[in-house]
């Protein structure tokens, strides 16, 4: 088989399964609206949970940072790319979340890959929730450690793995809020079991940070848990991009020595770190935005419970409506788009086979009438 045949067959498999991914060009998007071509859509596919991507103070901080520091960092943080804005942001994050250290990464994907591959050796094991993000599962699979997955959000399933012998160290991996189902992990139970077995817990709280807890401190704070490793990302509630790993001092120093994604990647622009400091202030002061988001979630769930579709058991901004069939999910997504609503159909392999869905995400930027319009069109599709 030639390279051309290999590529052609791989593409055809996705088409045959109604799982072919495409990108849509848009002219601008935020928590509420998306502009594509000549049309404006109500945006129910964004992770901009607090609407901060268009916040005036955040934008001004980026602009001021760019004028002061330029538009790029100029190198790895180990060479010339680590500036005062980076150091200040790391300290502010550590103080806010109650850890000695924070390390910045260019993305949550990079952070997860770096931590799992740098910390583990061949005699270690990684025990991961089956529905953990692709970045976690891929990093675990590529790490030298043995990977075992436990049933989603089932502490007893984790316990069955923890009691098995391991020559090295155990790292348990989960998410605070799961990106496709919107449900939350039982973090207190997972941490208790992990600690009792002498292991460490890593929580990726990409979809919980900024949204849950006092000052938006996230899922771990809400559940009274401090994992050994906390990954927070800035592409959701913060309205920007990038990530940070929160940990103890020796762990941070170890990652600085061994985390290749830190050592060999250009650091985020200092201007971005300036904008993230402004976004952090907005998150900390964002109780009104979080309350507004919760109101939109309750409004949607109360009415969506009467739809003839399976509504996920989510109390978060991620509200999946299970369709099952790949093609049907695409048809409904197109019909919603024709009605001026941007809703994304999520299909395997992103989610398990037979669980194609409309993944609806809500934002504090949405207005009550936006939710009413979405529900009106959904009712029309189902009846």
Curated annotation (Swiss-Prot):
Class of the enzyme per the UniProt entry, highest EC level: transferase
EC numbers on record: 2.3.1.47
InterPro entries xrefs: Aminotrans_II_pyridoxalP_BS, Aminotransferase_I/II_large, AON_synthase_class-II, AONS_Archaea/Proteobacteria, AONS_Proteobacteria, PyrdxlP-dep_Trfase, PyrdxlP-dep_Trfase_major, PyrdxlP-dep_Trfase_small
Keywords per UniProt: Biotin biosynthesis, Pyridoxal phosphate, Transferase
Binding site for substrate: 21, 133, 350
Cofactor(s) listed in the protein's UniProt record: pyridoxal 5'-phosphate
PROSITE patterns according to UniProt: AA_TRANSFER_CLASS_2 (PS00599)
GO molecular function annotation: 8-amino-7-oxononanoate synthase activity; pyridoxal phosphate binding
Domain of life: Bacteria
Binding-site residues for pyridoxal 5'-phosphate, renumbered to this chain: 108-109, 179, 207, 233
GO biological process: biotin biosynthetic process
SUPFAM superfamilies per the UniProt record, alphabetical: PLP-dependent transferases
Chemical reaction(s) catalysed: 6-carboxyhexanoyl-[ACP] + L-alanine + H(+) = (8S)-8-amino-7-oxononanoate + holo-[ACP] + CO2
Pfam families linked to this entry: Aminotran_1_2
Residues with N6-(pyridoxal phosphate)lysine modification: 236
Pathway given in the UniProt record: Cofactor biosynthesis; biotin biosynthesis
Quaternary structure, from the entry: Homodimer.
Function text: Catalyzes the decarboxylative condensation of pimeloyl-[acyl-carrier protein] and L-alanine to produce 8-amino-7-oxononanoate (AON), [acyl-carrier protein], and carbon dioxide.
Family: Belongs to the class-II pyridoxal-phosphate-dependent aminotransferase family. BioF subfamily.
Xref: NCBIfam families: bioF
Protein name listed in UniProt: 8-amino-7-oxononanoate synthase
Organism annotation: Yersinia pseudotuberculosis serotype IB (strain PB1/+)
Lineage: Bacteria, Pseudomonadati, Pseudomonadota, Gammaproteobacteria, Enterobacterales
Gene that produces this protein: bioF
